[in-house]
Design a protein with these regions (language model features):
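Bacterial N-terminal signal peptides
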Residues: 1-8
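Boundary at the C-terminal end of the N-terminal hydrophobic targeting segment
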Residues: 13-15
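C-terminal extensions
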Residues: 17-69, 107-166
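Small-residue hinge/turn detector
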Residues: 74-78, 104-105
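Transmembrane beta-strand segments of Gram-negative outer membrane beta-barrel proteins
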Residues: 126-153, 171-180, 209, 218, ...
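Exposed, low-structure sequence patches enriched in small/polar residues
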Residues: 153, 158-162, 268, 313-348, ...
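Outer-membrane beta-barrel proteins
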Residues: 181-194, 245-251, 308-311, 382-384, ...
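Outer membrane beta-barrel
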Residues: 187-283, 403-420, 558-571
C-alpha cells in the first residue's frame, strides 16, 4: 500500500522542499508502535539523545568520539567530515554537508538535530576566550499528581508522598566537565538516587578520563553496550562506542568507578586502549538463603518489600577494549570480568534456567569494521566462559547511490550466552541471548520530498521465553513512507505486520497502521493529525490524535497542545502516542480501553536565554471504567491529571 502510495505521488514531488525535521519527528519514528518488551533500554537512550539535542555539538570543533554519539553517523562518515574540514576549511552551512562523500540522505535529515555550525569568524576570534569560560546549567523538576493511588491510602502502602523531584546540573571549564544528579520517585520518602561524574578531555595520548558514573560500549554491544535500537531504524543507528559520562536519570544501566581512553598514533595505524573499573550496589530480590533471585531495574523503593531489595548485592566489573585502526580497517578485542558478592540463583522455572547463575562471570569478544567507499561491514563475536555460549552479530550496509541504502543484519545468540552489561539488537528487548535471526533493510529517497523505508525480520528462539512453554518464532515486516508536496504539508504513513507465538503459547498476528498529516503554514505554527489502528484476533483498537504547536516570533514563548481519543478492546490492542515532554525527559504514552487524553506544555525563555521555565499539564478521562490500574497503583476514578514544572538556569 505504501509503495503504491509513493509511486502515485512520485511525479508531484520533484523540486519540493521537505518540512524541517523536528525532534518530535525523530522520537516518533524511533518509539511509536513498538512493544515495551521490544524497546529494551530505548527510553534511556532517547533521554541521552534529548540532552545532546539540547546541547548540540559544534561540527567544526567536535572530536570524532563526540560526533559518534550522533544517530545515523558512521565511523566512515565522521572521518569524511574531518577530512573535508581539513581540506576545505570549516563548514559554513548545513547545505555544505551534501558535498561530503559518505553522508546519506538519512544523515542529512537527522544531523541538524544534534549539531550546530558556529561562524568561522567567531571560532577564530573567541577560541581562547571560549576555552577559559566557565559554562554550566542547573535544573529542578517536580511532578504533582492531582489524584491518589491506593498505595497512599492504605497501610501498609507507600511510605512517602506522591511527588516527583529531580535536580541535575553540569559545569564545563576548558577541557573539564562535571555533573551531578539526584532524584526522588513518587512514593519514596527522600532522595535515594544520587550520582555524578568528572570528565577530562585532551587531544594528546590521554583522550578522555571519566571518574564517577559512566557508560561504556564496544563493538556491537555483545559484552558491554550502552544503548540499542531495533525496528525500522536499527540499521541506521550505529552502536555507541567508547566511554561517556552518565547524564541521564536511569538507576540501573550505568557503571560507577573510573575509566579512561588512551590513544597512540603509530606508523601503521592508531592504537586505542580503554580500561574501566566499576563497583556499585544493585537492587536485588533475595531468596531465603540470601541468594539473588532477581536483579531489579526500576529503582523504586516505595514499600517495605521494595526497600528490602535496596542495594542488597555488590557488583564488580573490570575490563577494557583494545583497538587498532588503519585506513579502512578497524579491529578490536574486549575482555570483561564480573563478580557479585552474593551468588545469582534465578530459580527453577523453565524460562529462568538459562539466566546467569553463580557469582563470577567472564567474557571476551573480537570486533571488526571495514569500509569500502559505499560498502560498510562490521560485526562482533563474543564468548561467555562460565557456560560456554557464543554470540555473533554482523551489520552490512550498502549505498549503491546516495539516495538508496540497503542493509543486512544476521545474528546468532546462543541460549548459553549471557552478559549482564550487554545491549544489542534483539527481537525482544536488548539482551542478546536465546535468539537467531536476520533482518533486511531498505531506505530510499528517489526525489526531494518523497522517502520510503522498510525492513523485514525473522527470528527463532530455541529456549522457551517468559510465558511460553515451547520454542518460538517471530516474523515482522514494517514499511513507512513520507511525502511532502509543498513546504507547508507533509504526509506520513506506517504499516507493521507481526506474526508469532506470544504469552500463553498463542499464535497471533498483529496489524498496526498509522497515518499522519502535518501542516505548517509558517515557522511559528504547526498542526499534526494522526490516525492509529491496531488489529489482532479479529478485534480492532484505534485512536485519533491532534497536536498544535505555536511560538512567538522572538521565540521567548512556545506552546504545545495535544488531544487524543482512543478506543481499544483491551491491552492487547493498545496504541502508542508520543507526547512532548519537559526538558530532559521522554513521554511515550500507551493507551488501552476507551477514553480521552489531553495535554498542554508552555515554555518561557528569557531574552538572554539564561532562564527557562516549562510547565505541562496532562489529563486522561476514562469512559469505560471508574477504576484505573491494579494493586497499590489503583486509581479510584475516571480522571488522571498530572502537573509538571521545570526551572533551568544556564550560564
Amino acid at each position: 500500500m505504501l509503495l503504491i502510495f509513493s509511486l502515485c505521488l512520485l511525479h508531484h514531488a520533484g523540486g519540493q522542499r521537505l518540512l524541517p525535521y523536528t525532534w518530535e519527528d525523530f522520537v516518533t519514528s524511533m518509539t511509536e508502535d513498538e512493544d515495551e518488551e521490544e524497546g529494551g533500554n530505548r527510553n534511556e537512550w532517547i533521554e541521552e539523545l534529548r540532552l545532546l539535542h539540547e546541547h548540540p555539538l559544534d561540527i567544526n570543533n567536535a572530536a570524532p568520539e563526540a560526533l559518534m554519539q550522533v544517530p545515523t553517523l558512521t565511523e566512515e562518515a565522521v572521518e569524511q567530515i574531518h577530512a573535508y574540514i581539513y581540506l576545505h576549511g570549516a563548514i559554513q552551512t548545513l547545505g555544505e554537508l551534501r558535498l561530503i562523500p559518505g553522508i546519506s540522505e538519512e544523515m542529512l535529515r537527522v544531523l541538524p538535530l544534534f549539531i550546530r555550525i558556529q561562524p568561522q569568524a567567531n571560532i577564530q576570534g573567541n577560541k581562547g576566550k571560549r576555552k577559559k569560560r566557565l559554562r554550566g546549567s542547573m535544573d529542578y523538576r517536580t511532578d504533582i499528581p492531582l489524584y491518589y493511588r491506593k498505595g497512599y491510602c492504605v497501610s501498609p502502602g507507600y511510605a512517602g508522598d506522591p511527588l516527583y523531584h529531580r535536580y541535575r546540573g553540569e559545569l564545563e571549564y576548558a577541557d573539564a566537565r562535571m555533573g551531578f544528579r539526584m532524584e526522588k520517585d513518587p512514593g519514596e520518602t527522600y532522595y535515594d538516587s544520587f550520582g555524578g561524574f568528572l570528565m577530562l578531555e585532551k587531544k594528546g595520548w590521554m583522550r578522555r578520563l571519566v571518574v564517577g558514573d559512566f557508560r561504556a560500549g564496544f563493538g556491537q554491544g555483545l559484552v558491554i553496550g550502552s544503548g540499542s535500537q531495533w525496528g525500522i531504524s536499527s540499521h541506521i543507528i550505529s552502536p555507541s562506542q567508547g566511554i561517556r559520562p552518565m547524564r541521564g536519570m536511569d538507576e540501573y544501566r550505568f557503571l560507577r568507578g573510573v575509566s579512561a581512553e588512551i590513544r597512540l598514533n603509530t606508523g601503521k595505524g592508531a592504537l586505542s586502549l580503554t580500561p574501566f573499573l566499576s563497583w556499585r550496589k544493585l537492587d536485588a530480590t533475595l531468596d531465603e538463603e540470601g541468594n539473588v533471585r532477581t536483579l531489579r531495574q526500576d529503582g523504586l523503593h516505595r514499600t517495605q518489600t521494595e526497600r528490602n531489595t535496596k542495594r542488597s548485592v555488590g557488583h564488580l566489573a573490570a575490563g577494557g577494549h583494545l583497538g587498532w585502526k588503519y585506513r579502512w580497517l578497524s579491529l578490536g578485542t574486549t575482555a570483561m570480568w564480573q563478580q557479585t558478592d552474593r551468588p545469582l540463583q534465578p530459580g527453577d522455572a523453565l524460562y529462568r534456567q538459562i539466566y546467569p547463575k553463580g557469582s563470577r562471570f567472564g567474557h571476551m569478544a573480537m570486533d571488526y569494521a571495514c569500509a569500502f567507499y559505499r560498502l560498510q561491514i562490521s560485526g562482533e563475536a563474543a564468548y561467555s566462559f562460565d557456560r560456554g555460549g557464543w554470540a555473533t552479530l554482523h551489520r552490512i550496509r550498502w549505498t549503491p547511490v546516495q539516495k538508496l541504502q540497503l542493509g543486512l543484519i544476521p545474528r546468532f545468540y546462543s541460549y548459553r550466552y549471557h552478559s549482564m552489561l550487554s545491549s544489542a539488537p534483539t527481537a525482544y528487548g536488548s539482551v542478546p541471548q536465546n535468539e537467531s535471526g536476520i533482518m533486511l533493510h531498505l531506505s530510499t529517497q528517489p526525489v526531494e520530498g518523497l522517502s520510503f523505508t522498510a525492513y523485514a525480520d525473522a527470528s527463532h528462539h530455541p529456549w522457551p521465553r517468559y510465558g511460553i512453554q515451547q520454542e518460538s518464532n517471530i516474523f515482522r515486516i514494517q514499511a513507512e513512507g513520507e511525502f511532502a508536496p509543498s513546504h507547508a504539508h507533509r504526509f506520513w504513513a506506517r504499516y507493521q505486520w507481526k506474526h508469532g507465538v506470544e504469552r500463553g503459547d498463542v499464535m497471533r498476528t498483529h496489524h498496526q497502521i498509522r497515518l499522519q498529516w502535518e501542516w505548517r503554514p509558517r515557522e511559528q505554527h504547526s498542526l499534526r493529525v494522526s490516525l492509529m489502528g491496531h488489529q489482532a484476533e479479529k478485534r480492532i483498537g484505534w485512536g485519533l490524535s491532534g497536536r498544535w504547536q505555536v511560538q512567538s516570533k522572538d521565540k521567548q514563548w512556545a506552546g504545545t497542545f495535544s488531544a487524543t481519543y482512543f478506543d481499544t478492546y483491551d491491552y492487547l490492542h493498545r496504541i502508542w502516542v508520543y507526547e512532548p515532554s519537559l526538558i530532559g525527559s521522554v513521554s511515550n504514552g500507551t493507551f488501552s480501553g476507551n477514553g480521552i487524553r489531553g495535554a498542554g506544555k508552555i515554555r518561557w525563555k528569557s531574552r538572554n536565554e539564561q532562564w527557562t521555565l516549562e510547565t505541562k499539564i496532562g489529563a486522561t478521562y476514562r469512559i469505560d471504567t471508574r477504576i484505573q490500574g491494579s494493586g497499590l497503583q489503583t486509581i479510584m476514578g475516571r480522571w488522571k491529571t498530572d502537573i509538571g514544572t521545570l526551572v533551568r538556569y544556564s550560564f
